[in-house]
Swiss-Prot record:
Protein known as: Nicotinate-nucleotide pyrophosphorylase [carboxylating]
Gene Ontology biological-process entries: NAD biosynthetic process; quinolinate catabolic process
SUPFAM superfamilies assigned: Nicotinate/Quinolinate PRTase C-terminal domain-like, Nicotinate/Quinolinate PRTase N-terminal domain-like
Modified residues (Phosphothreonine): 291
Catalytic reaction(s) noted: nicotinate beta-D-ribonucleotide + CO2 + diphosphate = quinolinate + 5-phospho-alpha-D-ribose 1-diphosphate + 2 H(+)
GO CC aspect terms: cytoplasm
Source organism: Bos taurus (Bovine)
Region (Important for hexamer formation): 8-12
First-level EC class: transferase
EC code: 2.4.2.19
Segments traversing the membrane: none
Listed Pfam families: QRPTase_C (PF01729), QRPTase_N (PF02749)
UniProt keywords, alphabetically: Glycosyltransferase, Phosphoprotein, Pyridine nucleotide biosynthesis, Transferase
Amino acid sequence: MDPEGLAHLLPPATLAALADSWLREDCPGLNYVALVSGTAPSQAVLWAKSPGVLAGRPFLDAIFAQVNCQVSWFLPEGSKLVPVAKVAEVRGPAHCLLLGERVALNTLARCSGVASMAAAAVETARGTGWAGHVAGTRKTTPGFRLVEKYGLLVGGAAAHRYDLGGLVMVKDNHVMAAGGVKKAVRAARRAADFALKVEVECSSLQEAVEAAEAGADLVLLDNFRPEELHPTAATLKAQFPSVSVEASGGVRLDNLPQFCGPHIDVISLGMLTQAAPALDFSLKLFAEGATPVPHARRS
């Protein structure tokens, strides 16, 4: 999907609510430094100072809209950033612009970091000739999931399930609590009815076969070494060709190619969100008529 179109997935009311909550966290009461900056109309340039993929424009727009500022973008969503890049210009009252600055930078840096990591993983997987799905996981930052899931999409990865209601995933603890794979899957199948797919985490071929026999749509082969993963997936697919196979656990960028194979449909990586470094952005005010520069001028 075109990264520019992904913004339409984000409900405006949700964007506004998130922006409001982040701003309230940063300034729940008196903003003393507003007396320093004043209220004069001001302008600032958003600079990208590290390479990567630009992601998070809708969130930055929502943050600055909450503080009565306007954003003009110079680069589209999903752009490859080559530092130092002039990304956007923000205009508004000085105290409002600076009130939104840190929240906006944090959000854009995090979202772009996830998108950059996702893009690297997708490129690595495609380099092997594998055509399956590179996906994230539910290992996201509490309160920041929408930003991180959106970043995955901009980077070209699949978001996987957004929450517990998006897919019935039966994990090892569910199997333990239910008293076995078949009991757990049958209960999940009844709960899912026709509307949701059921995925089952399995640690052996026997569990995978039991899950498929009980009606699982997807089987997650968790923490399999590559030399075990591919024969297991091949055997399972031979018996149950309609069951999708996901590989997860211990997958990193450096070993991702080892997990790509003809019987693997999805490879999910928690590190896409857990290990993604934030990109470096800065916001610098400049005087009307002056040439913006990516560093503060000192007189």
